[in-house]
């Protein structure tokens, strides 16, 4: 892709470079990407039909799914060619590459506050089994935690997240608190009310403006069109087209074959 030609040069904002990456299950190829750079723009979207490989590719980036072949690297001024595909998931997170649902928490047993505390504690863990002072960790993050809980309407931090929407929102808040360099979000606004969706989008714009690269997968194309600077269209495991939202919306073949007229 033309947008990928800048790979290998110094970049001002973190990028993920995917090269010759493939994944198959039971003989069926679900991801087959020759070359793709994510992060040419502050906020990018991955779209495509069900089974296109979008979520699997995201999970491969954080090594939640092992690669059959290929390499995935983080490109940034501090670490120009960091091989993510050779790292365990927790180490990738310590390098600032964070994906939603990356930390598994039992929402039914932890309060909203405890689950956030768990997230920041795990993120600051320098090596497995190191013992942390949870009070010290919380003290460093308390103001930001309280601000985000208030902003998104989760005012009772001692309550338990019950609905799917509350759990999704809590996961987004955890990602924001971690201040990632590169943030991967899978369906971040699915099931959320319109007012909260707007707040999520506003917060992601602020995060991107501060230097974080954001990549989202979403079937709600209104979110894609209104939030993303660039969009990558995937189908049958391949990255087929890249462009700004307007050019993707006007690509008639893709609209007619995959997205439907109602999404134009």
Describe every region a protein language model picked out.
Residues 183-186:
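Catalytic Walker B motif of ABC-type/P-loop ATPase nucleotide-binding domains
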Residues 71-93, 132-134:
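ABC ATPase NBD Q-loop/coupling interface
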């Amino acid at each position: 892709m033309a947008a990928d030609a800048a790979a290998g040069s110094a970049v001002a904002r973190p990028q993920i470079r995917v090269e010759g990456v493939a994944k198959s299950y039971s003989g069926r190829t679900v991801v087959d990407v020759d070359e793709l750079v994510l992060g040419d723009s502050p906020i990018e979207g991955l779209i495509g039909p069900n089974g296109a490989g979008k979520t699997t590719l995201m999970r491969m980036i954080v090594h939640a799914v092992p690669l059959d072949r290929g390499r995935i690297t983080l490109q940034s001024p501090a670490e120009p060619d960091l091989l993510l595909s050779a790292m365990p998931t927790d180490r990738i997170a310590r390098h600032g590459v964070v994906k939603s649902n990356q930390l598994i928490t039992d929402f039914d047993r932890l309060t909203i506050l405890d689950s956030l505390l768990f997230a920041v504690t795990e993120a600051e863990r320098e090596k497995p089994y190191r013992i942390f002072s949870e009070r010290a960790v919380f003290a460093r993050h308390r103001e930001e935690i309280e601000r985000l809980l208030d902003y998104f309407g989760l005012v009772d931090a001692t309550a338990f997240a019950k609905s799917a929407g509350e759990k999704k929102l809590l996961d987004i808040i955890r990602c924001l608190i971690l201040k990632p360099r590169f943030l991967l979000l899978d369906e971040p606004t699915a099931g959320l009310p319109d007012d909260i969706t707007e707040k999520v989008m506003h917060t992601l714009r602020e995060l991107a403006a501060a230097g974080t690269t954001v990549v989202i997968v979403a079937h709600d194309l209104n979110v894609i069109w209104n939030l993303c600077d660039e969009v990558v269209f995937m189908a049958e495991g391949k990255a087929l087209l890249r462009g700004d939202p307007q050019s993707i919306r006007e690509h008639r073949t893709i609209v007619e074959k995959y997205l439907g007229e109602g999404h134009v």
